[in-house]
Amino acid sequence: MRFGHFDDARREYVIDTPRTPLPWINYLGSEDFFSLVSNTGGGYSFYRDARLRRLTRYRYNNSPLDMDGHRIYINDGGTIWNPGWQPAKTELDSYTCRHGLGYTILQGEKNGIAAAQELFVPRGDACEIDRLTLENKTAAPRTLDVFSYVDSACGMPWTTAPISSATFPPARWKWWKVPSIIRQSTGSAGITTPCSGPTPPLPASTPAGMP
């Protein structure tokens, strides 16, 4: 097929290019918490109600397409890229998206660094887990900056709707946009990290276009 194929053994749909005609979406969910994940890491999460309790921002049909979502940035000596290609759109040496039953894996490789971003919603808990695995395929030591990003919405269209504190569970929806910076390690970034203090500053290497 032109853009992907079915992997019957793993029960996955495998997408071989990030340049699909439209975002190709996988639906993840448990009892109360749900996420939509595109083949480039776009999408959004919501708690019980997709319209009234939307938690992160996402442009599905509007231009530009597939912006915002479940993003992880990798800074390798000034080369900034994403495992799912968007939004940096740095050309990858290899790319694969695996949409499975209840999970999505975005696999990208650039300059000898392989990254796999696995997204899933665990049963029995109201959260999304983004698990990042990094592999250095070269013989030389490498130093990387890795940081995650979400843009919270918390409700109806954010330009008009008031947000009631009673709408969402307490504390765990107080997110920051850059929950962690991880150096030379494999890390996990969950989008329910609480933050009681001020939003931490963005790293100096923040790509152009990020807030």
PLM segments and residue spans:
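Anionic coordination/interaction segments
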Residues: M1-P211
